[in-house]
Amino acid sequence: MVLGAPALIAAGCATFPDPATTRQIAETMVSEDFTAPTPALLKRLEQDRSQRICSRIGDAKLTQEEAAEVVQLARASIQYPASGRLVGDWKTGNTLAHDGAGDRIQGGRLEQRKENGGLCQNCHALAPDEINVGNVGPSLTGYGLQRGNSEAIAKLTYERIYNAWAYAPCSNMPRLGATRHLTPEQIAHLVAFLIDPASPVNKR
């Protein structure tokens, strides 16, 4: 039997709700909140297997088996540009790294007003002369200077941007490619922004 959100909340108030009940309450409220969802929007509201593992664990440590499963699923999700080029144009990547555009929900419909951005600067320090930067993630200043721009580094960088969980399961890094927020071509531009010697990121 599936209960509506009010009934679930009332039941939960009688005793402290267990995690399963709390999850059911949250999922029911979210699903009932959108009266005219599109299939694309409904899909965005569903957690995939990796997200369910990470949400269930919370602040606890993953077991080796759980970590291995998340990594395996993440690696299987990675797709590469049709052109085969993992390094695009650093200038385009610069724009993407500072652009926070994304999908918008209007009247229950998921709409895209413009091409999505990556907004990397929200969590990372990028060019050394920038002031408004984030510190949630590690600094990326001098990324290419420290690592070089070999094919191996380009591939590693591409995959970490596409789905960081392939290397750090359940990390806070958004899975920009796996969630289709960015296209493979856009991610290739971000790779160039990080490793191209001419990029502001790699200026001394």
Task: Give the residues covered by each predicted segment.
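Post-cleavage N-terminal segment of exported redox proteins
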Residues: 8-104, 160, 193-204
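Residue-level signal for alpha-helical transmembrane segments in multi-pass membrane proteins
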Residues: 5-11, 128-131
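Non-cytosolic head/periplasmic domains of membrane-anchored proteins
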Residues: 97, 107-109, 126
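Residue-level signal for mature regions of secreted extracellular proteins and peptides
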Residues: 6-7, 47, 113-116
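Short coil/linker segments at helix-helix boundaries
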Residues: 75, 103-116
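Extracytoplasmic electron-transfer domains, predominantly the class I c-type cytochrome c fold
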Residues: 20-21, 25-37, 41, 88-92, ...
